[in-house]
């Protein structure tokens, strides 16, 4: 079981604070976490934590933050195929009351072309749409090789249309629907019209809807994590993507309802922890979340 992930990497600095300073004010945060970040990157770490052999093609810098990122990947036995940038990208994440504000500093001025790997050795490819040229190349190569392709559609990007035509599973956010000016149900039809086999829209605390090639729309509610246990919702969607991929790779013939049920429990675990790394689930944590918060399996 192995998968290739293609996306943009960050170092996330997450801080819990009751007051956001302004002007010349200073405040002290209640807690903080420093971790890896990025949509496909966090999904890759999730898959690795769940025992999947994971390769990652992502941006990497030579500065000390880039070195720290590579050490994180090494800790989880993730093989990295770096695309060089001058500086590591940063995200400052401020979670509060079930929401999260994010301020990013991104370096996407690539100093090297992306590596062209043989995708035929993988069982799945997951993209977040970043590294536009690499995303298009790899999704087409995977389709030609018969490798399952998965897209995290957090937002419309310049390459989204081209990528969708070679995507098997597209799980998009509400923001994606809003950019299209479509309802969630209309977005499912939009995705299927472009050849997507499994189309899904995540709706936060309301859960998700999805449909397969027969067009039948199904709903899966989110597990109810009490407000007092919700610490940091950032990265929960990325963990969701990584978990459904892990579930699929373990049992490709199982229904997608099973894969998505597994993934929602993984997300329920994540939101109880500060930062992406602390929130990575293992199978025991996913089972616990199901039992505690009302999962079916």
Model-predicted segments: where are they?
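Hydrophobic anchor at the start of a short beta-strand
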Residues: 3, 54, 80, 149, ...
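Anion (oxyanion) recognition and catalysis
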Residues: 48, 74, 143-144, 192-193
């Amino acid at each position: 079981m192995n998968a290739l992930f293609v996306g943009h990497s960050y170092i996330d600095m997450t801080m819990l604070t009751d007051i956001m300073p302004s002007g010349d004010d200073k405040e002290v945060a209640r807690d903080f976490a420093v971790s890896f970040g990025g949509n496909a990157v966090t999904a890759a770490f999730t898959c690795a934590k769940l025992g999947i052999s994971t390769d990652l093609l992502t941006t990497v810098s030579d500065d000390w933050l880039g070195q720290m990122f590579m050490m994180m990947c090494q800790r989880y036995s993730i093989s990295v195929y770096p695309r060089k940038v001058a500086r590591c990208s940063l995200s400052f994440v401020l979670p509060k009351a079930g929401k999260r504000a994010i301020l990013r500093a991104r370096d996407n001025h690539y100093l090297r072309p992306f590596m062209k790997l043989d995708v035929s050795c993988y069982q799945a490819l997951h993209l977040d749409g970043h590294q536009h040229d690499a995303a298009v190349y790899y999704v087409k190569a995977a389709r030609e090789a018969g490798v399952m392709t998965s897209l995290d559609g957090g937002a419309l990007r310049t390459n989204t249309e081209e990528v969708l035509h070679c995507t098997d599973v597209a799980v998009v956010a509400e923001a994606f629907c809003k950019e299209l000016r479509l309802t969630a149900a209309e977005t499912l039809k939009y995705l299927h019209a472009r050849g997507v086999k499994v189309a899904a829209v995540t709706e936060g605390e309301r859960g998700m809807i999805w449909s397969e090639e027969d067009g039948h729309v199904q709903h899966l509610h989110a597990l109810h994590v009490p407000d007092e246990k919700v610490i940091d919702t950032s990265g929960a969607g990325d963990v969701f993507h990584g978990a459904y991929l892990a579930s699929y790779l373990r049992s490709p013939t199982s229904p997608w309802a099973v894969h998505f049920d597994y993934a929602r429990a993984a997300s329920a675990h994540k939101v109880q922890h500060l930062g992406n790394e602390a929130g990575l689930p293992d199978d025991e944590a996913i089972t616990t979340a199901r039992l505690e918060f009302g999962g079916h399996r």
